[in-house]
From Swiss-Prot:
Protein name (record): 15 kDa cell wall protein
Cellular location(s): Secreted, Cell wall
Protein's organism: Nicotiana tabacum
UniProt superkingdom: Eukaryota
GO cellular component, as recorded: extracellular region
């Protein structure tokens, strides 16, 4: 979810 993405580092967001 968006909330989870906001807590993840950029390389995880891109994955």
């Amino acid at each position: 979810t968006i909330e989870e993405v906001l807590n993840l580092p950029p390389y995880v967001v891109a994955a």
